[in-house]
């Protein structure tokens, strides 16, 4: 019996991307994309971030597809108790992001189902943003932009002569994002 993977695509990572990544693997593969728009997905994400993964019902097409799944891979799809209970052979939930707000980890763990997030998936992007924000703060970019938009042309911002090259700057921690700076 081959391992059956079901990919649940969404408005940001479609199921075809999972299929492409798993092409050639000795598995049985099926997929389904969540219906709706990016706005619908964003609303569902916000609800799950506040109320948890059981606050948004899974799509009926998803429930039908995962009944015989051994592995589910998804990004933001709601994977609460209702979804987990439909798949008696489920062994692993792989999430294509670091956050697990959309997964009922307690239910999965109680059933012996592994839950694997993609820690550090966006670490480089966040590290680059962090460098940009440090530069923006040191050089007063946001305040200068706001002043210009209001018709001003300030020439005297506090710290205007600060240059990163002559400063000690950094971040606290050496997790995924901290290591991206090294």
Which sequence ranges carry the predicted segments?
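N-terminal glycine-/charge-rich "phosphate-binding" loop or analogous flexible N-terminal tail
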Residues: 1-71
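Alpha-helix capping/helix-boundary segments
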Residues: 13, 78-80, 177
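Rossmann-like dinucleotide/phosphate-binding beta-alpha-beta segment
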Residues: 158-181
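Short gly/ser/thr-rich secondary-structure transition/capping motifs
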Residues: 52-57, 74-75, 149-156
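Short hydrophobic/charged patches on amphipathic alpha-helices used for structural packing
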Residues: 60-63, 81, 161
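Phosphate-coordination loops involved in phosphoryl transfer and adenosine-cofactor binding
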Residues: 2, 90, 165-168
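Phosphate/diphosphate ligand-binding glycine-rich loop within oxidoreductases
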Residues: 67-145
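Cofactor-binding loop segments of dinucleotide-utilizing enzymes, especially the Rossmann-like FAD-
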Residues: 8-10, 98, 174
